[in-house]
Amino acid sequence: MSKRTGLIGTKIGNSSFYDDSGKSLPVTILKIDECVVSDIKTIEKHGYSSLQLVSINGKNEIKKLKKPQQKMFADLKINPKKIIKEFRVDQDNTLDIGATLDVSHLKTDQFVDVTSVSIGKVLLELWKDIILVD
């Protein structure tokens, strides 16, 4: 199975979808922002093949960025982005620097793997349990 690059998005919420037989299926609604390829790592130079993507507008003040990030966004001629992620890909699935990706990158009926970052509310849940028990 070939490795293709991923996309960066944010979770909007959950809903349900009904198939043709009337069965309810739970779905997660995602907002996929435009992703821009900011760097390419090759097997010859780095020992592995990957693409670095930037997405989600957020950092308005360029002075708050580190110097290498300022140079990267200046070279790409785009506004600074909030998220920078690297995706390992096969050597033949690389794209050019500056290429943009959106939802059209996905194929119809394609299964996708999703990873997320939790904001960690475990301590809050623990305190709720303690307060409710007392």
Annotated model-derived regions:
Residues 1-134:
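Extended basic (Lys/Arg/His-rich) segments that typically form rRNA-contacting surfaces
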